[in-house]
């Protein structure tokens, strides 16, 4: 295991060369003390090269799938807090300190961010709303974007072995 700063920004990527540099730069600005990791999941473009040039620590994950990549990240990286974000530029890095603050102040295990501007087609928006409604009805949690790839979690010793991380809905 590698010891890092207290916050590790984890960015699983597949063919994100168009957005990865701005995502990395956004986190360098909003969380300057964090360590930024990009795990390239068999990209056929220049994602890994551009991420390294932007200053991220880049690693390869040859086993296809976001869940596999997340498990590898949790197994490889040690930090007090993990911030997970997609490399596609969907989320606002400037909001990261607010997610971390909420996690610490409320002493909770995970905070889920949301997409401010849902850049999906109408079917995706409707599906997301339906799943959010169902989740609220079943579990009582007030999620606005259950499928968000923007999350901050407190480090947990079982995270790398968790079967829940082997499957992630998008």
Q: Model segments located where?
A:
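Short beta-strand/loop segment that forms part of the nucleotide-sugar
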Residues: 11, 24, 33-42, 59
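Short aromatic/hydrophobic "clamp" motif used to bind/position activated sugar donors
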Residues: 82
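Acidic helix N-cap motif at the loop->helix transition within catalytic regions
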Residues: 18-22, 45-54
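A conserved acidic beta->alpha catalytic loop
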Residues: 40-48, 89
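Conserved donor NDP-sugar-binding/catalytic core segment of glycosyltransferases
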Residues: 97-122
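Conserved donor nucleotide-binding strand/loop of the catalytic core
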Residues: 35-37, 48-76
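Short, well-formed alpha-helical segments that are part of the catalytic scaffolds
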Residues: 15-29
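Conserved catalytic loops of nucleotide-sugar-dependent glycosyltransferases that act on lipid-linked
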Residues: 69-70, 74, 90, 120-170
